[in-house]
Amino acid sequence: MCGICGIFDRSGNQVDQGILQKMTTILQHRGPDGEGHYIDGEVGLGHRRLSIIDVEGGAQPIGNEDGTLQIVFNGEIYNFVELRKELEANGHRFTTRTDTEVIVHAYEQWGKECVRRFNGMFAFALWDANRRELFLARDHLGIKPLYYVDLGNRILFASEIKAVLQDPECPRDVDVEALAELFTFRYVPSPKTLFKGIRKLPQGHRMTLSRRDIAVERYWDWVPCLRGNFDEEDLIEEYRTLLEDAVRLQLRSDVPLGLFLSSGVDSGALLAIMNRYSSGPVRAFTIGFEGGEKTNEVEDASAIARMFGATHRFMTVTPEDYLKYYENYLWDIEEPLGNETAAAFYFVSKIAREEVKVALTGQGADEPWAGYDRYLGVKLSTFYSRMPSVVTDQMAPLFARIPGRFERMKRGVASLSEPDVLTRFTKIYSFFNAEMKRQLFKGELMEQIADDEYRSKEALRRLQTDVQHLDPVTQMLYIDTRASLPDDLLMVADKTSMSNSLESRVPFLDYRLIEFVESLPPGLKLKGVTGKYLHKRALEKWLPKDVVYRKKKGFANPVEDWFRNRMRPFVEECLLSSDSAVGRFFDQRYIRRMLETDRAGKDQFRRHIYLLVSFELWHRAFMKN
């Protein structure tokens, strides 16, 4: 895993080497092991290397035999060994042992269709000097990031936003439409970012740049095609075989690797499979939080580690540790999020990097397999919408009594009476609902985003279009895997691990596993009220049932309680000071009422406060400096 960047001048002018150098330098944390550049007239490529495969011989950029192809690459092609054999059989000759060089020869052999053959996580830029074209691609699930900005006469791209901002002509303005979407979804859906004009190349997409044209196209998708007749036991064996092969491939490394271990079933299963293929004890790493006893995973994770003879290292994060990191973490992740797990990934990456360069994680099994409560809510809402009004009218007063701290449940209940699936989804996903936004957003901002609710629904409609003929649960699983997974959770994992110069890998997001899951009927994912049904049945092969069916904790933390108590002065300074960015965009009187409600012990605004503080810190990091 590395950091890549580059410039393509559409007017044909020579690339500014000084800007390219600045772009490369600011990505040093992604690749502390080396730096490389390539310039050919209108194109410039930059690379920072974190050496994983062929440590001695894998410096980038890498070219073909005559130098007419040059590539900078971030990520891993896990099936590079098999592809190399196929390419050698077709007459290609290699000078390194890297997966990077496999991409170059795959492009020679299959052209732009080569991306369909890669099993991995990747973002790369390949310069074809004969065609005078720059070819960029991002992996199937969007595990590795790739940003770009069109400045008219030139296009810049990079693994991180801060690199493209090194060009003084790159604007630093807030995209107010993206801001509205952030407060709806808790993240900004692709292709937008919170920076006006800076875009993400979406998952499973490729882009070709030439002086004549900019072409972006999708090369892969997994529109569900549900199986008809099936045998459940056969499906379980098929899934086990695919998962085991995914882990086997992702253990390919020339440097030490380990595992982020929680108390849950997903990382526990990875440990069991890793233990089978590893020559020595697996190194496992876990994070706990002071005051987070209800969600602390260290004890249960230690028991799983002992079960498989793994070495286990853990850290207990204090409020002081968190505050020291939190003031700078928006510089790492580059966009504010309502995702409070970022700190957990940062700290577990920090302790892991002291021993390994690569860590496998259990991310990616919840969104495809219905691992969250909201999927059950969608299923129940389908039944509720079919009930006669005489029944639902009797239930409404009971729903009104749900305490404010159960904010997600209240949102789900509010959607129950909606007959339209898309409207139901919009209510479920709306973090700040329409009424909250009217009170929070200042008048001039509300005028700019007057059609916010319509656009939020349209953002979901774009994702839903290909699956609207399917049941609501399958639709939501598809939307989450296409949107919240790459634009929120995977982005956090990449940025926080790479800020520690650590590569994180996600075996559950092997694209073959996703295609398998998407072929299953919803009843094998969410059976009755049990999420991840067939997934858990398959994992019984490797783990005791009490671990497989243990209540999910995840990398949780008590940060929202810290905000109310020990971090309260910091929170109030961020949100209520007269020179804050929050005060420019939002009504501080409403924010003060939110804080007063929170201090009174009512929980309905805790996560909203977290997002507001994140926005303030992001603005300080990128707009003020």
Descriptions of predicted regions:
Residues 1-333, 345, 349, 540-541, ...:
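Cysteine-centered catalytic environments shared across enzyme families
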Residues 292, 317, 336-339, 386, ...:
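Alpha-helix capping and helix-loop boundary segments enriched in small/acidic/polar residues
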Residues 18, 234, 238, 242, ...:
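Generic recognition of stable, solvent-exposed alpha-helical segments in well-folded globular domains
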Residues 30, 80, 143, 164-167, ...:
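Phosphate/oxyanion-binding loops and surfaces in catalytic or ligand/nucleic-acid-binding neighborhoods
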Residues 1-4, 113, 166, 197-203, ...:
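Adenosyl-5′-phosphate
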